[in-house]
Structures are given as structure tokens and as C-alpha cells.
């Protein structure tokens, strides 16, 4: 069950080194927002009835098996399970192999390599001509807001507020408690659990100017390492006999689930649940580590990776890129599983379609994604979608950080690339080898099916190489954007 809704004035959760200076200025800002809400109330009321609000919720490193509704008997996600029961659920859905690539694709509707993002920082600078999701909503008369993980997309020589967000509180690093929150030149030192603060910030935004449509992103940093949570969430897992590592991991997930529950309850308490499209996804698959230099114990990994998917975060095996997508719009979108194959690039075209916003309202490069609206409104619809092009972010076959300031010709055979389609997935492995997997019968990618489907293997191989060549020809990928990353020695 979602808890009762509650609003939290930001002044109760944010503190600064000089509160006597900061708090009055913020209070004035909040009052100004409330005053604006009364201006043109009749027009705003009409807009609110005809245009849905959009709430985008993104979790961090939450793999396909990290949910109760996908079949994990140990993890506790009652809120997300309920959201799934009320949503269209896409289980044949893929993101990129790591956070920055996924988020750049999410916010641009484009394949991440073409946006200039080819890894995590410092390989994650978006090109300045990329248009981001909130810009389309702002152009359509929406208020826009962001709270949470800072690497939505790194924006050299511009700020997030120049790219479509009216306001945004960006968590620096993985501070699960008492985070630093930059916002329009202010650096705020918040007090409390970050998951709760993200929820509070979004709720304050929702209530600040009633009657005008809004687009908000809640980007939680859970369950990204380090696993740090309130002990009341990890204690039940310890009592069940789970290891401290897994108890903290699942405790973090449970804490985020509770925060999302309060967020959804707040939307409902504001009377806006029926006119709000809620979209939920994770940015990539689960990490195979318990700490930066220590892998999760094999027994814990088996308990977490209950579907036995191959790989992990940063790889292009299924466990690195497959996550569920949830879309809820009460009374408009019927709940239930969708068989349609989708990819993260599809989210932007889809929500613009649902909101009735024109994509040509903002100058942008061509979307790689397509709208999933047909499948949302008719569960029987399964339309052909082009395979998703993906690249490993770390390990064998990944672009190396040192290439950033020492560019050299890129060879197809040096990388681990995949073409992931609705049923078939083609791997171009480093060293020139390849494999084809039939995910309909082999979702764990255990048996090369190229000999059974030689024509499909040949076709996907040629298409993958063609896309790679076309990408390099644009000059947009693998840009020289920063210094060499220092080598990190392993802890003894």
C-alpha cells in the first residue's frame, strides 16, 4: 500500500551554511510560485484537464531480478509491485549498459553513442546540439523539475537549467544521506536520507503551482553502491538469514520503494493521480559487486540474479541491459503485460505522444526511438522494431578511457557490440568472433544459435557492422573531451 500523502516544505529538509541568508530567499521563491499559481487559473484548469502530468521515476542499478513483480521471492517491493499491477508492463525492454549512456538515450530519444556519450564520466559529455526531454515539455507549457542523480547527462559549457529544467536538485555522487544538492548556482547541504529528500522535493514542486501541467523526474540513486540504508529496512533481511551485503542491498531497495510509495501517495493526495502518467524504469542491470573491489558472494549472486541472466551492469549480456518498463495512466491505459519489444530510446517519443506534444516544437536531431503508444492502448499490438545497438561499457570489448585524449582508429573487432531485437540477439565479440542467441528459447544466452539460423545471423551481422560504420562516419562518437583517467590500483 502507498502511505498517506504528505507535503514537505523544502525549508524543513534543506539547510545551508548561512541559513539566515538562504531561507528567506527560498521562502520568497516558494511564495512567488504559489502566487503564480493563481494567475490565469481558468486557463490552467483547462490545461490540467486536457494535458496529463508526467512523472518519470528512474532507479539506479536495479536489475531485472530486483523486483517482486518479476519473480524475486526475497526482495520487498510492495509499492513497485502495486504500480506494476496498475501499469502496462514491458518486460522485453532494454536500456544501455551503464547509467550515463542510458540516461543520455532516455533524455534525447537517441542512441547514446551518437549523442557523444560513450561511457561514464569523463566519457559522458553530451554534445551541445542535443535537445533534452524537459525542453519539449517546457515548450508545451509545462513546468519542469528534476531531483536526484546528477549524471542525467553531463552538459559541458551549459547548465541543466539551460537545457529545459526550470528547477533541479542534482545529487552529487552517491551520497545516500545528507547529500549536497546544487541548484542554479546554489550549493545546498541537505539533511536526511537522499531517497526521502528526492520525494520531498518532487512533492513540493507538485504542490507549488496547482492547475498547470508538470513534468518531473525522480532519479533515485538506489541500489547503486555503496549499499547504505536505514537499519529498519535492512534488519528484516538479516533476520531472515541473508548476508549483511544482501541485506543492505535489499534494504536499500525497500527504502527506495517506501519513498516511491510516499511520492505516488502525494500525487494522489493532490488529486492528480488520474491525470498523471507515471513512467518507471531502471538505468541498467545489477552490479555483480558488493563493494568497489569486492565481488558479491556466489550464493548472494544466485539469490539476487534469480532468473540466471548472463552478465551484469556494464556488459551487453541480458543482465546488463534488460529491465522492466512500467507506464501507468489510470482510466486510459489498461494494466497488463505488453509483448511489444522496446528500448530506452522509445521513452521520449512515447511520453510526448501521450502528452500530445509536438516533437518539432524544439529543434532536435532525429530520434532513434519510436512511440510505444499503439501497444499501450492495445495489449495485442506487437509491431516490428529495429534491433537496439549496444556497446559494452567496461571490461573486454569496451572503449578504453585512455582513448579519450589519445584517439586512434576504432576497429569493429576490438569491441563487444550487440544488435538486440525482439527475439534474436547478435553479439559481435572482441577478437572477431560472434554469436547469435534465440531469446525466446534461451533468455540466459547459453547456446549459440547461429548454426540453426544462419540467414538471421548473417543479416544481423551485416546490419550491425553497417550501423557501426555509419556511426563512425558521423564523427559524433568517441569524442576527445577530457584527460586520461588515472589508473586505479586494486586494494590489497
Predicted segment positions?
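Bacterial N-terminal signal peptides
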Residues: 27-38
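Formylglycine-dependent sulfatase
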Residues: 44-430, 434, 443-466, 476-492
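Intrinsic-disorder-associated, low-complexity terminal segments enriched in Asp/Asn/His/Tyr and depleted
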Residues: 4-6
Amino acid at each position: 500500500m502507498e502511505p498517506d500523502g504528505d507535503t514537505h516544505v523544502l525549508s524543513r529538509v534543506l539547510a545551508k551554511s548561512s541559513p539566515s541568508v538562504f531561507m528567506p530567499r527560498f521562502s520568497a521563491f516558494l511564495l512567488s510560485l504559489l502566487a503564480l499559481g493563481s494567475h490565469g487559473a481558468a486557463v490552467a484548469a483547462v490545461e490540467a484537464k486536457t494535458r496529463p502530468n508526467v512523472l518519470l521515476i528512474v532507479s539506479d542499478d536495479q536489475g531485472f531480478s530486483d523486483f517482486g513483480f518479476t519473480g524475486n521471492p526475497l526482495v520487498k517491493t510492495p509499492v513497485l509491485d502495486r504500480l506494476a499491477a496498475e501499469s502496462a508492463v514491458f518486460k522485453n525492454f532494454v536500456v544501455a549498459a551503464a547509467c550515463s549512456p542510458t540516461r543520455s538515450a532516455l533524455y534525447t530519444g537517441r542512441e547514446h553513442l551518437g549523442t557523444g556519450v560513450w561511457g561514464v564520466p569523463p566519457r559522458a559529455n553530451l554534445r551541445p546540439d542535443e535537445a533534452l526531454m524537459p525542453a519539449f515539455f517546457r515548450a508545451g507549457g509545462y513546468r519542469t523539475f528534476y531531483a536526484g542523480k546528477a549524471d542525467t547527462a553531463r552538459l559541458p559549457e551549459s547548465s541543466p537549467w539551460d537545457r529545459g529544467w526550470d528547477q533541479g536538485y542534482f545529487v552529487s555522487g552517491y551520497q545516500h544521506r545528507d547529500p549536497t544538492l546544487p541548484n542554479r548556482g546554489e550549493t545546498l547541504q541537505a539533511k536526511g536520507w537522499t531517497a526521502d529528500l528526492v520525494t520531498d522535493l518532487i512533492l513540493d514542486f507538485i504542490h507549488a503551482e496547482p492547475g498547470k501541467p508538470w513534468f518531473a523526474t525522480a532519479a533515485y540513486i538506489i541500489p547503486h553502491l555503496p549499499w547504505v540504508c536505514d537499519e529498519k529496512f535492512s534488519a528484516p533481511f538479516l533476520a531472515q538469514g541473508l548476508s549483511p551485503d544482501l541485506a543492505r542491498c535489499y534494504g536499500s531497495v525497500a527504502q527506495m520503494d517506501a519513498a516511491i510509495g510516499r511520492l505516488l501517495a502525494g500525487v494522489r493526495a493532490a488529486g492528480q493521480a488520474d491525470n498523471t502518467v507515471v513512467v518507471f524504469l531502471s538505468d541498467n542491470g545489477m552490479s555483480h559487486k558488493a563493494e568497489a573491489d569486492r565481488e558479491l558472494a556466489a550464493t548472494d549472486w544466485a539469490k539476487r540474479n534469480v532468473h540466471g541472466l548472463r552478465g551484469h551492469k556494464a556488459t551487453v549480456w541480458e543482465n546488463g541491459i534488460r529491465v522492466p518498463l512500467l507506464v501507468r495512466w489510470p482510466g486510459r491505459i489498461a494494466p497488463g503485460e505488453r509483448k511489444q519489444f522496446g528500448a530506452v530510446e522509445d521513452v521520449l517519443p512515447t511520453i510526448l505522444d501521450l502528452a500530445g506534444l509536438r516533437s518539432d516544437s524544439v529543434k532536435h536531431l532525429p530520434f532513434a526511438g519510436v512511440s510505444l503508444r499503439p501497444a499501450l492502448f492495445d495489449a495485442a499490438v506487437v509491431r516490428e522494431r529495429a534491433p537496439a545497438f549496444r556497446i559494452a561499457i567496461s571490461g573486454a570489448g569496451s572503449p578504453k578511457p585512455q582513448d579519450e585524449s589519445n584517439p586512434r582508429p576504432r576497429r569493429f573487432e576490438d569491441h563487444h557490440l550487440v544488435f538486440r531485437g525482439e527475439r534474436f540477439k547478435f553479439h559481435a565479440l572482441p577478437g572477431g568472433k560472434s554469436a547469435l542467441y534465440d531469446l525466446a528459447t534461451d533468455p540466459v544466452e547459453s547456446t549459440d544459435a547461429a548454426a540453426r539460423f544462419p540467414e538471421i545471423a548473417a543479416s544481423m551481422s551485416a546490419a550491425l557492422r553497417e550501423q557501426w560504420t555509419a556511426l563512425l562516419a558521423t564523427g559524433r562518437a568517441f569524442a576527445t573531451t577530457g584527460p586520461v583517467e588515472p589508473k586505479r590500483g586494486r586494494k590489497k
